[in-house]
Amino acid sequence: MSQFARLLHLADSALPTGSFAYSYGLESSLTFGLLTTETEFRAYLYSFLQQAVGFELPFITAAAQANNITFSTLLLEYDAQLLTPALHQASLTQGKNWLKLLTTFYPEAGLAELGRELTQQALPAHFGPLFGLSLSKSGFALPDIQAVYLHLALRDQLSAAIRLGFIGPMAGHRLQHDFYEIFESLLDSVDIRPYTEASRCTLLLDVAQMFHDNLYSRLFQN
């Protein structure tokens, strides 16, 4: 029970990792008219989660099972595939904050040493891989790590939509509840793809994320 409570704590939106500052292309998608209805937003969310399963989760899964040597290679591979500058910077910022928090929460997990090694080797401390490795070292099971990451991805998108005024809080939380029904089918496909075959499959999302810097007025950093 205590481990479950700790997992809920790590999934708390108030945890200061910086995720509240990023919309991952949602703000520009709304501004440029790519999304105008709730039906389109549902399709967008499904595509967003599919991309998380196809790209982030293979890295997270591999990181949770990695040793120091393979983790270094994994980090460099992830860094090479994250081509959108705003996403790249957001990942590094969140990774740094996340590792700092987990080092404080779980000093016995050896995360302080991991942080020093990343600095000494000048390795990019990306959020996704560090999320998987740090939670694994802290004693959490792989299925829980995968499910929590997908929950965070969904929660942050819906939170951004609410803050942008596209949907109301009640509608947003109803959508979040509805999407939990498809988590199992999405997660079933995670383990069949190694991180060397991970891919970003929704190009329009990447384009929207790249155009974010062109917004005249914006609430989010990406």
Q: What is each of the regions a protein language model found here?
A:
Residues 1-222:
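Metal- and O2-centered redox machinery and metal/ROS homeostasis
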